[in-house]
Amino acid sequence: MRSGENNGRNIAFDLLRIIAAFSVVVLHVSGVFIEKSPVGSLDFRLSNFMNSISRFGVPIFVMISGAIFLSEEKKVTVKRLWSKNILRMFIVFGVWSFAYYVYQSIFWWKFDFWRHGIVRTITGCVYASDHFWFLFMIMGLYALVPFLRTWLHHAEKKELDYFVILFMIFQIGRTTLMILIDKSLVHKIFDLVKIVELSWYLGYFVLGYILMRYGVSRMVKYVLYGLVPVGIIMNYLISDYMSLQKGAYSPGIYDSFGIFTFIHSVALFVFFKDVFSKVKVSGRIEKWCVNLSLDTLGIYLMHIALLDYFESNGFIVGSIPHVPGILLLSIVCFVICGIVAAVLRRLPFVGKYLC
């Protein structure tokens, strides 16, 4: 048996990546079911609930990256960041954006490079799929790592607490208020202080490091755990109410910077860090977790294309009830993408640039 933290690798992070990747798949699968269900119907509400409990994926991914890249134990140089991490992400984006563009061209219109021209092709690749925003965001955070490490490694705990407070006020609080009350009023209030955009995902990135290094007190931990079910219920009820009021699906409260999604994400991160970092696992289980964790980027990149294929061929909404349908389709999508990612990742020379 081996410790959950072995050979410099924390199995808690591997498990979190797997769960976060699956939550992203559930999020997008349930979103398709929601779009095809009348607002206020039982199917709409069940699908919306599934959507509400699967919003923690991206914050978890970002906190894991922050905990790893900002750690004192990891050796990081500007050259290594750009030549290995950022360059790899850029190549991954280029490969998959072109693949999505060709896929969409073949299925939705006849692909003809000479007719489209290089400018239209490049533009089409850049905007081939909305979910590629994550790659640009993570590359931006990677670029800031050297500055963040210098600050964080010399900062006192009270300074880090101050940063978290600012993040919660100017990002979490602001976003939540903008969803619940008049946006223009919130803008006017927060615009008085010109640090409204202080954090964005940088807040989650730094928070991952802080939680990993310092943790939280027992009281804060139990408060977080206790608020998770309350937050999930409130998230769902607010979205359901706003959807009924607008007559259309209204998922605004589910934003990554909404207070309830924030609580859910932080509580999960803390729980896995505290529990699974110390758990004893067999070498076989550890190997399985590590390999599947390494496939999560490929799963994230591919699942939209597979989901689109399922939807266009009528596999999404049929006679199967929504909740079992969402779970079944999510599992199928996750497994297929995981298998393909595992194969691509093992290709000599080019595998690391594919997923």
Question: Which residues fall in each region the model found?
Answer:
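Alpha-helical transmembrane segments and terminal signal-anchor/GPI-anchor hydrophobic tails
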Residues: 216-290
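Hydrophobic alpha-helical segments with transmembrane-like composition
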Residues: 61, 70, 100-108, 112-183, ...
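C-terminal "closing" transmembrane helix and its immediate cytosolic amphipathic cap
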Residues: 2-5, 273-293, 304-355
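Transmembrane alpha-helical segments and their boundary/interface "anchor" motifs
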Residues: 51-60, 72-105, 109-130, 141, ...
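Interfacial loop-to-helix transition and helix-capping segments at the boundaries
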Residues: 46-58, 122-137, 179-203, 236-267
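Functionally critical transmembrane alpha-helices in membrane proteins and complexes, commonly lining
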Residues: 11-71, 89-97, 127
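Aromatic-anchored segments of alpha-helical transmembrane domains
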Residues: 22, 26-29, 97-98, 165-178, ...
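Membrane-interface helix-boundary motifs at transmembrane edges
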Residues: 6-10, 73-84, 148-160, 211-223, ...
